[in-house]
From Swiss-Prot:
<dbReference type="InterPro" id="IPR002252">
    <property type="entry name" value="Glyco_hydro_36"/>
</dbReference>
<feature type="glycosylation site" description="N-linked (GlcNAc...) asparagine">
    <location>
        <position position="720"/>
    </location>
</feature>
<dbReference type="GO" id="GO:0005576">
    <property type="term" value="C:extracellular region"/>
</dbReference>
<keyword id="KW-0119">Carbohydrate metabolism</keyword>
<dbReference type="InterPro" id="IPR017853">
    <property type="entry name" value="Glycoside_hydrolase_SF"/>
</dbReference>
<feature type="glycosylation site" description="N-linked (GlcNAc...) asparagine">
    <location>
        <position position="57"/>
    </location>
</feature>
<comment type="subunit">
    <text>Homotetramer.</text>
</comment>
<feature type="glycosylation site" description="N-linked (GlcNAc...) asparagine">
    <location>
        <position position="49"/>
    </location>
</feature>
<dbReference type="GO" id="GO:0004557">
    <property type="term" value="F:alpha-galactosidase activity"/>
</dbReference>
<dbReference type="InterPro" id="IPR013785">
    <property type="entry name" value="Aldolase_TIM"/>
</dbReference>
<dbReference type="Pfam" id="PF02065">
    <property type="entry name" value="Melibiase"/>
</dbReference>
<feature type="active site" description="Proton donor">
    <location>
        <position position="572"/>
    </location>
</feature>
<dbReference type="InterPro" id="IPR000111">
    <property type="entry name" value="Glyco_hydro_27/36_CS"/>
</dbReference>
<dbReference type="InterPro" id="IPR013780">
    <property type="entry name" value="Glyco_hydro_b"/>
</dbReference>
<keyword id="KW-0964">Secreted</keyword>
<feature type="glycosylation site" description="N-linked (GlcNAc...) asparagine">
    <location>
        <position position="452"/>
    </location>
</feature>
<feature type="glycosylation site" description="N-linked (GlcNAc...) asparagine">
    <location>
        <position position="500"/>
    </location>
</feature>
Amino acid sequence: MFGSPKRAALAAASLLAVFGNGPSVMAQETSSNNAVVADGKTFALNGENVSYRFRVNETTGDLVSDHFGGSITGNLFPGFGAEALGGWVGLAGRFRREFPDHGRGDFRIPAVRIRQEAGYTVTDLQYQSYSVIPGKPALPGLPSTFGSEEDVTTLVVHLYDNYSSIAVDLSYSIFPKYDAIVRSANVTNKGTQNITVEALSSFSFDFPYEDLEMISLRGDWAREAHRQRRKVEYGLQGFGSSTGFSSHLHNPFLAIVHPSTTESQGEAWGFNLVYTGSFSVDVEKGSQGLTRALLGFNPSQLSWQLGAGETLTSPECVSVYSSDGIGGMSRSFHRLYRNHLIKSKFATSDRPPLLNSWEGLYFDYNESTIYRLAEESAALGVKLFVMDDGWFGDKYPRVSDNAGLGDWVPNPDRFPDGLTPLVEDVTKLKAGNSSTDLRFGLWVEPEMANPNSTLYHEHPDWVLHAGQYPRTLQRNQLVLNLALPEVQDYIIDEITNILNSSAISYVKWDFNRAMHETPSPSNDHEYILGMYRVFDTLTTRFPDVLWEGCASGGGRFDPGVLEYFPQIWTSDNTDALMRITIQLGTSLAYPPSAMGAHLSAVPNAQTGRTIPVKFRGHVAMMGGSFGLELDPAELQEDEKAEVPGLIALAEKVNPIILTGDMWRLRLPEESNWPAVLFISEDGNQAVLFYFQLGPNVNHATPWLRLQGLDPKATYSVDGNGSYSGATLMNMGLQYKFESDYDSKVVFLQKQ
């Protein structure tokens, strides 16, 4: 016990021996851009507005965290952490640890847990050396951010357990322009006996003692990305996915903020795991008040055996720091992802307005009805026509969700001569009154198989299954095991054949169920690695195809998918009122340029709500990929007359949405008048989306203050007057709305 002053003093002395009394003076081994400064004892990563510092205790080799926040220079004030020792917490649990291992007196959740052949899970990872790399190496088999030597510098810190011969490399890549630090870790078995990695975090950080709050995105099918903000309490709290994919339920995103932090003011730390599989986000406030945040693999679905010489690499985690509130955090994510994550040529290219056949026809179509829908789409000004589910399956035709998945050949009853004649006819159509040819796109769900399919009858062993346990169906389908190379090759070959057969310029890649009955805990990660191989092969082979990800809506809206697919269907819920919440929630981490958003028919298929077409269109065009989800023949005449103008407006705002900065001025959960401002990359143009949700009877309408403008510049507002940026930001503007579900799109031009 530490009851007596003498024992407390002895304990304090021993604790200081382990972790040191404070940072030592930094030597000057510096990267060319000053982004990384290291001397083997202290380490500093420097961005335009961020500093990240940690050090090595020279006695024990432990890494100790010092700072992650606003820019600092010079020596650090010598802090302390060993005063209050009158408790039972192990000594290591009282300090801020950079990469906490397991079993040595730190009883908080560890960043790594490894079971050795003898059964114990103790590790003693000590600092060995470091290296600084200009640029950023790619992660083997995993999506990762990228950049040139001018964009990013990487620090790798090498740790080693002398008792078990386990090596861990910690990678820190700093993008100074974005105040972003990207981290990952790998574990290598340097010994002769097998080890099993049971937990591995990509990112770990211990915040100092202070009151903090955490923000996450929760939801379910058709109500993804609902913002949740709560106090960080003492003890363990967190969330994750065990579905085998990132999921609708929780997103692999976390923000840590102060209670006073708002959209535009205060500090915010954002974390986003670049991974599409099951994950875990853990936040623990320990007994000393230190808050630990970890993001990485879900330990319940990780049991990864490493033989001698083998390595397990974690996904990477992007962390950003903002002193400009939650909005500043989001804009850092957006800029980084547009420029250094999404590899597609379409990352910042104008996206064609499209019409998807799903909500217009569902499964009920043939070649003539599809062509009729394409004709009517072109007449409205649509430039891309997408044929959704229902076009494939020969022996088991896909006329419902009960059959056909896995058999990627055109349904001979619907398309007797294959897809080529249809594609040729559709791509001869002109978009509206222009000379632009209509493009053709296709829906696929290659990771699935129906039991009613030729594929399943020939290869029942290709689906996920656990011995003799029943194979649980969801949506009448099973999941192909992409951990198997032969399954990966089959999917690559089938999709290649389809894309080579006709002029298909767009693919919507869907995924409509969770993973059950996996054969082993490691299969989940093996599946994701196989999926990434498929994505990488196909997107590299067909770089001119615009790929869109989907998983029953936003079930796989994560950075891992974004590397390969520049846009993702945000939600199967196309109700415009709910979409405002979903899209603004998604924008906490993900750029609007990546969001698919469609104007659909009313009453809405998901909610039954009827909302004016203008409001529906304005909400949809806040996404980078604007489209229609309806049958034009079913539109009322007044609605049909408005649609071409909405398409033209969407095309006008699209370049600003794709490359500009987003400012969430008001949130739908906080105001009857949510508003979003997009400002072009050069600052010369801006577009304001302004909504009234409910009626406002006999009551004033609030003024709306803009943000992000140049206070000294003058702006033309919709061509009807000129106002200074200072006036628009400090006084604001005011509009009258006529009714509920009214909306306005306002253009600003810098003069």
